[in-house]
Amino acid sequence: MKFTLVATVLLTFSLSAFAVEYPVLTTASPDQVGFDSQKLHRLDGWIQNQIDAGYPSINLLVIKDNHIVLQKAWGYAKKYDGSTLLAHPIRATTNTMYDLASNTKMYATNFALQKLVYEGKIDVNDLVSKYIPGFKDMPGDKIKGKNKLRIIDILHHVAGFPADPQYPNKNVAGKLFSQSKSTTLEMIKKTPLEYQPGSKHIYSDVDYMILGFIIESITAMPLDRYVETTIYKPLGLKHTVFNPLMKGFTPPQIAATELHGNTRDGVIHFPNIRTNTLWGQVHDEKAWYSMGGVSGHAGLFSDTHDMAVLMQVMLNGGGYGNVKLFDDKTVAQFTRRSPEDATFGLGWRVNGNASMTPTFGVLASPQTYGHTGWTGTLTSIDPVNHMAIVILGNRPHSPVANPKVNPNVFVSGLLPAATYGWIVDQIYGSLK
């Protein structure tokens, strides 16, 4: 009996020694973790001034030392129906879900890849062609190199692909036109390289569309199902999904974006273009028309609390609570600066030089990494200060400033709130 009891105790101790329990987020007052509350709360008035000036909404959450110290929403999830200002606009709340745009690249695609790398199911030095049959140089290609492209080249954005081929717009895409997922993969294979791979960095949506297809090839699952069932559900995330309107969410739970579909107030036209105010559907054209709302480069929706958990996973070195997705070595591998450009990791943008000041401000540590999204989203993760910031916004939910001059500049994009670094600096400047 004594031997059995001792053996049981030793076995329990042995198992607990190997069990990993990661920090989970709790709330704390700013003063408890080194902030000057009065300075931090000055942001309140400044952001409200930006809302009064026409910025649609801002949702902000700040993490310090495993604590949420600030979480607040300003403005409106929906204030327009087309060009008409609503008599009773829908206020944003801290539970409002936002179109993450290119932050999808990190919190869907990169998280999936980091998990698969940790599990030994993929190596970043593998050739792309290992996972995508027929991915090779085409006859007549002026620039060769697809045959030798590795996943790491795609992650570093040095693969040679153009930034935005605009597959769903036949007027621009020409022979590469596609408004179906299966056709889009074939068009990606046919997309000519614009520069010799490895010769420069060009941030490209195509790179992450390819990575999404690679994840689906490895897992034999659609990208959304894979991340939602193996990453978000184990973490207890309730509001992080692709195609939210197909998964039980309703428009009032989500921040609206462009006023007239993807027409930029009526100056852009192509077959099947949406013209209604976008509300609960991904704004990105390639993600919506060419990929059915689920793509490696865009399509994910979330709220600030769920995003905080995902950022805490990175600060924790790969896990949260009793859930382990990957390890600290994987985090280091993916956030290490590219030797060619210090502002790129493996997908992650890194605070490598002054060019990242508009994103990360001037006070974040050089080791800070994160990403931005075209709809008005920022994630900033600072392992030195053990701090993270998420800003979610719906910047395109305002008129286009001058559609004929530049259809991609919205009135709200001309306001200071559109520059994330300023907000980030006010937060860091509030540290004692």
Curated annotation (Swiss-Prot):
InterPro entries, per the entry: Beta-lactam-related (IPR001466), Beta-lactam/transpept-like (IPR012338), Diverse_Enzym_Activities (IPR050789), Pept_S12_YfeW/YbbE-like (IPR022849)
Lineage: superkingdom: Bacteria
Protein keywords: Carboxypeptidase, Cell inner membrane, Cell membrane, Hydrolase, Membrane, Protease, Transmembrane, Transmembrane helix
Cysteine pairs bridged by disulfides in the record: none
Protein's name according to its UniProt entry: Putative D-alanyl-D-alanine carboxypeptidase
Regions that span the bilayer: 7-25
Subcellular location per the Swiss-Prot or TrEMBL entry: Cell inner membrane
Highest classification ranks of the organism: Bacteria, Pseudomonadati, Pseudomonadota, Gammaproteobacteria, Enterobacterales
Name of encoding gene: yfeW
